[in-house]
Amino acid sequence: MALTKAELAENLFDKLGFSKRDAKETVEVFFEEIRKALESGEQVKLSGFGNFDLRDKNERPGRNPKTGEDIPITARRVVTFRPGQKLKARVENLKKEQ
């Protein structure tokens, strides 16, 4: 099971008393700000949660799994997430409790 944007909005509605429309808009604006920061090459740091970074990957050799043909995998930029210490600790504690 995965947490969706709709569920995040529902939580804002339930816990903070936002209207459903405002809750949905708040979630959309939050993620749009993260998208814009990453698109402009900025790192996103969410204290107590983790960091979103951009990483450049070099071109490398690859292989077509169907044909076995060697093909180059093109250079690209990827988004990475590194969880913060607090998030890591909370997740680790969940494992121990289960």
Curated annotation (Swiss-Prot):
GO function terms (MF aspect): DNA binding; structural constituent of chromatin
Region (Disordered): 51-71
Matches recorded under SMART domains: BHL
UniProt biased composition (Basic and acidic residues): 53-69
Keywords: DNA recombination, DNA-binding, Transcription, Transcription regulation, Translation regulation
InterPro entries registered for this protein in UniProt: Hist_DNA-bd, Histone-like_DNA-bd_CS, IHF-like_DNA-bd_dom_sf, IHF_alpha
Listed GO biological process terms: DNA recombination; positive regulation of metabolic process; regulation of DNA-templated transcription; regulation of translation
Alphabetized Gene3D superfamilies for the sequence: IHF-like DNA-binding proteins
GO cellular component, one term: cytosol
Xref: Pfam families: Bac_DNA_binding
CDD domains: IHF_A
Subunit structure comment from the entry: Heterodimer of an alpha and a beta chain.
Job description of the protein: This protein is one of the two subunits of integration host factor, a specific DNA-binding protein that functions in genetic recombination as well as in transcriptional and translational control.
Family stated for the protein in its record: Belongs to the bacterial histone-like protein family.
Protein name stated in the entry: Integration host factor subunit alpha
Gene label: ihfA
